[in-house]
């Protein structure tokens, strides 16, 4: 068998700085370095056009998909029209998936979360049917599952969810990013999985701050003497950003809390609540997703667009008070960019990450006086912060580097394809 294969990544969106898109980039980078060729199917893609196959209906934010989800979730019955439209969209997407496989002569699919969480049910059904009909070797890379999300618990789509999220098919090989996901997948479906955690390129240190990244503060109206607290997540309730606002208030120092991402697919009500709370507590809150991209560039209105790296380099402290995380990309990013972090010790962190020895300012259900005291100490003592972040970086290099991902992917491809 040819040792180099053509691989197709499939997701609802492969663009921007969300966790799935970022991890896809890392997998693609490693697989390309190993000599394989990678191609991309999604509702939105910022990969080169020659390697992308874009079908708008594959995006979870497509109007038809949003309309379907409105009838499928928070209800126990769906309309016949919804069922008919799902079937029509499934066929439409399956036709394009067949063409994607044919036109790029693919030998392996890697499905990024589109067989894990039912944000686009027609796409999941189309993928499951394609795989069942072709027996095409497939990796289901599961970042989080539908049963982990509150909004998918009341459903008129349980028949679809059981069939495709995830599908139990002989040629689908399941990869999860945490041990809890592996146990739940086995308990609920009886199938085994491979655990491959998220990673960062710890063997290549982050770039040093430069004049471009120094423009972050003036561009966002943040004073040079303000402490910049970075909340590097989407604006969704499970991120508990209200606790980051509370921390900023209780530090009793000049602070700006910057939120890096948008709300994504979960509406704007939570953002409105956060703005109101910040006003009540007299905390400066900046939502900066409109000036953050994957690469440095310029917006149509002339504003500079910054990378996440630029934002991290200007941050004094990272806040991460989530109740639930599939793994914790923001945690790894904070470690990589050598920033101290105040965070809730969510379940996956306690099970999979904390035992490795990382040093964080941790709390459980609420921010305590001790949490505030430790955060103040870190902000006021650069030497203490430097020692904490140096220690964490070395652990990150040991456990979550690209080398670890490369070894895991080599073994996985050998098991699936014998290469």
Residue map of PLM features:
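Aromatic "clamp/platform" in nucleotide-sugar-dependent glycosyltransferases that forms part
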Residues: 323
